[in-house]
Regions:
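Short coil-to-beta transition motif at edge beta-strands of beta-rich domains
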Residues: 1-13
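Non-cytosolic beta-sheet module surface loops
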Residues: 13-15, 331
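Short beta-strand-centered aromatic/proline hotspots
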Residues: 17-29
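Conserved beta-strand residues within beta-sheet cores
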Residues: 18-21, 98, 132
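Short, solvent-exposed secondary-structure boundary/capping segments
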Residues: 30-43
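Intrinsically disordered, low-complexity, charged/polar segments
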Residues: 47-129
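Extended, compositionally biased accessory segments flanking or bridging domains
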Residues: 126-145
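Concave beta-strand-loop units of leucine-rich repeat
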Residues: 140, 146-166, 172-190, 194-288, ...
Length: 350
């Protein structure tokens, strides 16, 4: 089905686990990027537990993208005219905009809309303070070290704070790198909706509960850690030490939204049967036997060698839901080990 100007579509957003909507604002002519016309798609400010209905069309408004460090603007994207099957046509409205669009891509998977809706859920006072801090030329002190109020990243190695609560002086902080444990770190993280990236090394903890935080990307030293609880929105967990861990990882929906990255060796995490993605780096010898039984719903498998060898590569054929598969600097397999399209019906990128 080809898109037409004014058409409104609804689609399930895998990140929000709810339905969202968009409008084809206009059809753009061919340009230097493509000889084909483009559909310019506008995200709409609507979220629902069920698909959008025609009765709701008159109440729709455009979605403005201004989350985190983005300047406020309509969320527009040039996409191919062919509408993906997961998008359902609801009806037609007069186009909301004819604003020029210079961003290109495929029909959105909804990630930017998810981040915008998540941003709008934060208290308005906090969002306003974030934007003001972004533009500020002022300074404050963290651990006795002068730091710009506009800083979005702090490393305790260079700003050696004792109490993590000192970081409240940085309203647009979004990334924290800790080389040691801070007793009130969890209190600070649970009170800040904008800390999305955390690196935690040499923490000395046996258990770590990050529920109630907003961390999307976690770089974690697994040494000595026995039990880990991830928050609702954690998308990436990157181990920071080589070798096998001995940790039980608790993730929402048994890891359905989580990608895990290990270094060198992997201890199969049977408690994550729904794990979405698995990345391995610095591999010397890695055996794929039995991995699909541990993570049967894996969507992405990416492996990097040191360089190294892969054993039993043909075992990837057991990942029936895999969409993305890649290996780099890894050897030990041949053409006969490559799975057939029938074995991996969902594979889109290899």
């Amino acid at each position: 089905m080809k898109a037409n100007a004014g058409e409104v579509y609804t689609v399930y957003n895998q990140y929000l686990k709810r339905y969202t909507a968009c409008q084809v604002a206009y059809i753009a002519p061919p340009d230097t990027v493509s000889k084909e016309s483009w559909a310019v798609v506008l995200s709409l400010d609507w979220v629902g537990d069920a698909p959008l209905t025609a009765e709701e069309l008159p109440h729709l408004r455009p979605l403005y993208k201004d989350f985190m460090y983005w300047s406020r603007d309509l969320h527009l994207l040039r996409v191919p005219l062919e509408v993906p099957p997961q998008y359902t046509l609801v009806g037609t409205l007069p186009p909301f905009t004819d604003q020029p669009c210079r961003s290109y891509g495929g029909w959105s998977d909804g990630y930017d809309v998810y981040l915008q809706i998540r941003w709008q859920a934060a208290p308005e006072k906090r969002r306003r303070a974030f934007k003001e801090a972004m533009e500020s030329d002022g300074e404050t002190e963290i651990g006795g070290i002068p730091v710009k109020v506009s800083n979005h990243r702090v490393m305790d190695q260079y700003a050696p704070f004792d109490s993590a609560l000192e970081l409240k002086a940085l309203p647009c902080l979004s990334e924290l790198i800790c080389q040691r444990w801070h007793p009130d770190l969890l209190e600070f993280l649970r009170g800040n909706p904008f800390i999305s990236e955390l690196t935690l090394l040499n923490h000395g903890q046996r258990t770590l509960d990050l529920r109630g935080t907003s961390i999307r990307k976690l770089m974690l030293d697994m040494t000595g850690l026995e039990e880990l609880w991830l928050c609702e929105g954690t998308e990436q967990l990157l181990f920071q030490n080589k070798g096998l861990d001995a940790c039980t990882i608790h993730a929402p929906e048994d890891g359905s939204g989580l990608t895990l990255q290990f270094i060198g060796e992997y201890c199969p995490h049977t408690e994550l049967p729904n794990l979405r993605g698995l990345h391995g780096i610095e591999l010397k010898d890695f055996d794929l036997t039995g991995l699909a039984a541990v993570h049967p719903h894996l969507k992405e498998l990416r492996l990097w060698g040191a360089p190294g060898n892969l054993q039993n590569f043909s075992a990837v054929g057991a990942f029936r839901e895999l969409t993305n598969l890649s290996t780099f600097d890894l050897f030990g397999f041949g053409a006969d080990d490559i799975p057939t399209p029938e074995q991996m019906p969902e594979l889109r990128w290899f």
